[in-house]
């Protein structure tokens, strides 16, 4: 999967807005362009929360895509923009925001 931190998405949009667009109908993908294995993503969350998840593996489901990530080459070519946030930092920032916003204590977070 391609996980993209919100600040990178906002910066990507600003890069487009701040610069004249040669083709006003061109579509740009904004994403991380670095696929992350789902188990690696889960491991990052576990580490940030200092909790261990119970993982149940299932067969691939109809409609599931094996690999998916954004091709951001046009965004880079036209605006020299690349996302900067790695998965560890982005997940940590999101979890910190979530716990603070919802006033949840990490040790009280119920995971199922």
Tell me what each language-model feature is.
Residues 1-112:
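C-terminal substrate-binding subdomain of Rossmann-fold SDR/epimerase-dehydratase oxidoreductases
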């Amino acid at each position: 999967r391609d996980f993209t931190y919100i600040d990178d998405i906002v910066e990507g949009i600003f890069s487009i807005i701040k610069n004249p667009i040669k083709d006003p109908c061109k579509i740009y993908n904004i994403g991380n362009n670095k696929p992350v294995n789902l188990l690696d993503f889960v491991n990052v969350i576990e580490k940030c929360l200092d909790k261990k998840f119970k993982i149940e593996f299932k067969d691939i489901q109809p409609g599931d895509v094996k690999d998916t990530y954004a091709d951001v080459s046009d965004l880079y070519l036209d605006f020299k923009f690349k996302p900067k946030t790695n998965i560890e930092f982005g997940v940590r920032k999101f979890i910190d925001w979530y716990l603070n916003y919802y006033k949840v204590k990490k040790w009280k977070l119920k995971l199922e």
